Amino acid sequence: MQPSGHRLRDIEHHPLLTDNDNYDSASSSSSETDMADRVWFIRDGCGMVCAVMTWLLVVYADFVVTFVMLLPSKDFWYSVVNGVLFNCLAVLALSSHLRTMLTDPGAVPKGNATKEYMESLQLKPGEVIYKCPKCCCIKPERAHHCSICKRCIRKMDHHCPWVNNCVGEKNQRFFVLFTMYIALSSVHALILCGLQFISCVRGQWTECSDFSPPITVILLVFLCLEGLLFFTFTAVMFGTQIHSICNDETEIERLKSEKPTWERRLRWEGMKSVFGGPPSLLWMNPFVGFRLRRLQMRTRKGGPEFSV
């Protein structure tokens, strides 16, 4: 039954939930604080494979840079400076990847379209609200349903299989940092590859590496291809994300050419909203706000999920 005084708009014309509907009361009454305290993890096969591949490719790049190019070098400070720099970029990139993957992107609580919740909203007469028929929640403005996460996500930009998660309101910052650090480490690796090729050609491939010349060439060529591919992809994604933040428009909203019904923020206001606070070095730190949590498995209606 639909409460008077407002209208519930549902594309599939599902009725408003009542107390007798078969939904988990715990999920419908969960607060935003409870949602924020959970470690988020999407059990999607494709996403998990892509996430593991990302880590393996970064580890491979670190192996080639460290053991093929830097350790055999006779220039001590060249090896130390570049080794520290590349490994720092790799650690920051992988840390940003983890934060993006394990952070709730802004999921709307499931099954909150109850009569009690509707009454608590204190809606004005004639005001229209939207309900998602798939996860049975009241959709806030600019929220979209993700078929992979099976949740409505606030300010959903897109679902990225490489981080096995949606990019939304709460984890967009970490995704931006991930793309930035991968792009920087790719540029660094490409520069080192170029210098290594020059050194090997001048030395006639005799003392440029501890590996045989054919293996060295194969490792360097593969790293160059990986670096070019990663740099192109992440640089484009980084630019797209910064453009979206500055224009206060998600990728989904841009593709749908939706007319804004919200007041757009100024460019710097959008950046401060995503990265938190005025410009500082903390914007570059993926560890800000990190809390070590204990993972455990809880069985809930609809399947198991990881939580604390």
Swiss-Prot record:
Q: Which residues cross the membrane?
A: 51-71, 76-96, 174-194, 218-238
Q: Which GO terms describe its molecular function?
A: palmitoyltransferase activity; protein-cysteine S-myristoyltransferase activity; protein-cysteine S-palmitoyltransferase activity; protein-cysteine S-stearoyltransferase activity
**GO cellular-component term (any):** Golgi apparatus
Q: Does the keyword DNA damage apply?
A: no
Kindly report every residue range on the membrane side named Cytoplasmic. 1-50, 97-173, 239-308
Q: Catalytic activity annotated for this protein?
A: L-cysteinyl-[protein] + hexadecanoyl-CoA = S-hexadecanoyl-L-cysteinyl-[protein] + CoA; L-cysteinyl-[protein] + tetradecanoyl-CoA = S-tetradecanoyl-L-cysteinyl-[protein] + CoA; L-cysteinyl-[protein] + octadecanoyl-CoA = S-octadecanoyl-L-cysteinyl-[protein] + CoA
| Superkingdom of origin | Eukaryota
Q: In which tissues is it expressed?
A: Ubiquitously expressed, with highest levels in liver, kidney and brain. Expressed in all brain regions.
Matching entries from InterPro entries are given as:
Palmitoyltrfase_DHHC (IPR001594), PFA4/ZDH16/20/ERF2-like (IPR039859)
Modification after translation, per record: Autopalmitoylated.
The membrane topology term of the UniProt record is: Multi-pass membrane protein
Q: What is its main location?
A: Golgi
* EC id: 2.3.1.225, 2.3.1.-
Q: What happens when the gene is disrupted?
A: Homozygous knockout mice are viable, fertile and do not display overt phenotype. Knockout mice are hyperglycemic, glucose intolerant and develop a type II diabetic syndrome. Zdhhc3 and Zdhhc7 double knockout mice show a perinatally lethal phenotype.
Q: Which residues form the DHHC domain?
A: 130-180
Q: What does this protein do?
A: Golgi-localized palmitoyltransferase that catalyzes the addition of palmitate onto various protein substrates and therefore functions in several unrelated biological processes. Has no stringent fatty acid selectivity and in addition to palmitate can also transfer onto target proteins myristate from tetradecanoyl-CoA and stearate from octadecanoyl-CoA. Palmitoylates sex steroid hormone receptors, including ESR1, PGR and AR, thereby regulating their targeting to the plasma membrane and their function in rapid intracellular signaling upon binding of sex hormones.
User: How does it associate, per the subunit comment?
Assistant: Homooligomers. Heterooligomers with ZDHHC3.
Free-text domain note: The DHHC domain is required for palmitoyltransferase activity.
This one is known as Palmitoyltransferase ZDHHC7
Which organism is this entry from? Mus musculus
